[in-house]
């Protein structure tokens, strides 16, 4: 159920270049279940900036009543969010969207998780939940450079993990698709989140496989009312789907990337 709450900042720390890990406490956590969903955060009490920021859920801890989100400081909104200290509160709406289908990976199957940059965070909760279901998880994480790398050890706790950097400063030099090819990584189902070129490359590389992609789009309302995040459906000039409410996770081929 979607709710709204002024959640309390439990902790915040810089974990990579311009990348922050923010942990929030509140009753709204009990509504958070599906990996790949997101929350819409109002970063300031004033009307500037006006729009909420869509931030994916990285970790859900029902026992502690806490959720963790990871974001990159890009503009005024996230700069304000980066200033939040423990004890401060933020206005949170969520959980929103349709996340990754866990049922696509039955017990004893092999799931390949592929993340690019700030698309990595939602895959962490996915890795955790898949592992609990008896799924073998292999992760491939892509970043621009070593300074941008985060959560490598955290993913390694769930299984085989590979890192690629564009400049070769850490892990494999190149892209996530280079790692998949070089390592001949096999899978029964693939889950991915990251920039569109990466998602497009994965969809084209595995056209007849179960591939689920989480799209990153700018959003206005987060609930499907404003039509700011629509994407087209293949074979139609008029049909579309909304990333915020129909997604953000789609099966490859379901929408035009």
UniProtKB/Swiss-Prot annotation:
Pathway: Pyrimidine metabolism; UMP biosynthesis via de novo pathway; orotate from (S)-dihydroorotate (NAD(+) route): step 1/1. One of its GO terms (biological process) is 'de novo' UMP biosynthetic process. FAD binds at residues 53-56, 70-72, 77-78. It holds the Pfam family FAD_binding_6. Residues 2-102 form the FAD-binding FR-type domain. GO terms for molecular function: 2 iron, 2 sulfur cluster binding; electron transfer activity; flavin adenine dinucleotide binding; metal ion binding; oxidoreductase activity. Binds 1 [2Fe-2S] cluster per subunit. Binds 1 FAD per subunit. Keywords: 2Fe-2S, Electron transport, FAD, Flavoprotein, Iron, Iron-sulfur, Metal-binding, Pyrimidine biosynthesis, Transport. SUPFAM superfamilies: Ferredoxin reductase-like, C-terminal NADP-linked domain, Riboflavin synthase domain-like. PROSITE patterns: FAD_FR. InterPro entries: Cbr1-like_FAD-bd_dom, Cyt_c3_hydrogenase_gsu, Dihydroorotate_DH_ele_sf, Dihydroorotate_DH_Fe-S-bd, Dihydroorotate_DHASE_ETsu, FAD-bd_FR_type, FNR_nucleotide-bd, OxRdtase_FAD/NAD-bd. [2Fe-2S] cluster binds at residues 221, 226, 229, 244. Gene3D superfamilies: Dihydroorotate dehydrogenase, electron transfer subunit (2.10.240.10), Nucleotide-binding domain of ferredoxin-NADP reductase (FNR) module (3.40.50.80), Translation factors (2.40.30.10). Its cofactor is [2Fe-2S] cluster; FAD. Coiled coil: none annotated. Heterotetramer of 2 PyrK and 2 PyrD type B subunits. Belongs to the PyrK family. Responsible for channeling the electrons from the oxidation of dihydroorotate from the FMN redox center in the PyrD type B subunit to the ultimate electron acceptor NAD(+). HAMAP family: DHODB_Fe_S_bind. This is Dihydroorotate dehydrogenase B (NAD(+)), electron transfer subunit. It comes from Geobacillus kaustophilus (strain HTA426).
């Amino acid at each position: 159920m979607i709710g709204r709450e002024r959640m309390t900042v439990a902790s915040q720390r810089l974990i990579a270049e311009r990348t922050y890990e923010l942990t929030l406490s509140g009753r709204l956590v009990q509504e958070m279940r599906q990996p790949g969903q997101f929350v819409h955060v109002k970063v300031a009490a004033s009307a500037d900036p006006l729009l909420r920021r869509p931030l994916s859920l990285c970790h859900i801890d029902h026992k502690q009543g806490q959720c963790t989100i990871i974001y990159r400081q890009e503009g005024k909104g996230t700069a304000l969010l980066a200033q939040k200290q423990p004890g401060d509160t933020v206005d949170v709406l969520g959980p929103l969207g349709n996340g990754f289908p866990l049922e696509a990976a039955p017990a004893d199957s092999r799931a390949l998780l592929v993340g690019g940059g700030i698309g990595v965070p939602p895959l962490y909760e996915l890795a955790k939940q898949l592992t609990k279901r008896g799924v073998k998880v292999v992760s491939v994480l892509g970043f621009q450079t070593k300074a941008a790398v985060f959560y490598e050890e955290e993913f390694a706790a769930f299984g085989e993990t590979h890192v690629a950097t564009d400049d070769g400063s850490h892990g494999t030099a190149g892209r996530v698709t280079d790692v998949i090819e070089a390592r001949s990584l096999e899978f029964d189902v693939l889950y991915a989140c990251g920039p569109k070129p990466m998602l497009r490359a994965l969809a084209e590389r595995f056209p007849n496989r179960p591939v689920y992609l989480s799209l990153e789009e700018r959003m206005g309302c987060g609930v499907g009312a404003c039509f700011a995040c629509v994407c087209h459906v293949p074979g139609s000039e008029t049909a579309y789907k909304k990333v915020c409410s129909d997604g953000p996770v789609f099966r490859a081929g379901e929408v035009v990337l």
